[in-house]
């Protein structure tokens, strides 16, 4: 047995390349910046700028769909040129330079524009970065690699709202001052990817792809890949924007100062669970883990509807974070293993386009149900879609194993 194989079997927490750690730290810093803003943005839009819950849902859905559409082309371009890092750096750079727009924005239109451009940056970097993680990860360790990156990414999403809470207190609920501080970690992330991440050489024997989005190349993605996409799409319909968790907390009566605790709590559970879940997915049935994640999402939705007060809110948020930890890195690992190495960028781009459209629909449906029926209808609909995804997973479980 080789030393690398022995390490993989006995020490699943060690032996991942430095590049994966560096990419995780880049993601962490950018998420500190983004979540400092995102934790406050729904309330800032509704309280400060007079937007409705439906408007918040539309804004969030369009923003994420914009990112998803961009990922298709950046992922395909990374396959065509055989390079991932440069496109990822452009995406992080674009996100960094748009951050100052949030504190400077005088109207809702400016905030929406900043949010959309920020998501374009996310779209440009997303597929090439995920393909780069897959390229760097040792064979049989992709679940652990994606779990590590997801954990560090989510650690940033945990730190960001905590900073937002402290700064909202320090700045006497001045949203714009908090948004200015959020500019700093965004530019630190840009510097880190430029100088600390090294792309591996293209492996010998990997063919060059002239047009990754051609019909012939898309057919090479294979049936297992499209099965993963199908399951993830229905799953995404059940998992609308976390902005509605924030609005639910405000509805229950959580004070403005403590609103960022919603994302702090969710992301703490997400960060702690993502890496162990990734390691576990390298060692057991991934469909079983997906099914468990769907069950946790259903439980989270029901708790947020049925359990009273702050205790129910806290439990629902924790279950939501745990379902994210179990499923998000797992889906990324399934995509990496389902497709040829030379088409990974395209595969991630198509995956994110389709699930991004589903997220747009999910957020619009969630916002409409909230506005016209009530918050309970939003979470009950999410539980219903999660149950449908679980039913759809049953006939696909052998194909995904």
Give the predicted meaning of each segment.
Residues 2-17, 199-231:
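Juxtamembrane intracellular "pre-TM" segments in multi-pass secondary transporters
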Residues 80-92, 283-294:
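Cytoplasmic membrane-interface "Motif A"-like loop-to-helix N-cap segments
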Residues 114-155, 334:
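Cytoplasmic helix-loop-helix junction between adjacent transmembrane helices
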Residues 43-48, 159-177, 361-375:
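Transmembrane alpha-helix termini and helix-breaking/packing motifs in multi-pass membrane transporters
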Residues 10-64, 225-262:
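Helix-loop boundary and gating motifs at the non-cytosolic
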Residues 70-82, 168, 273-285, 370-371:
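Helix-to-loop junctions at the C-terminal end of transmembrane segments
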Residues 93-106, 295-308:
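C-terminal ends and interior cores of transmembrane alpha-helices
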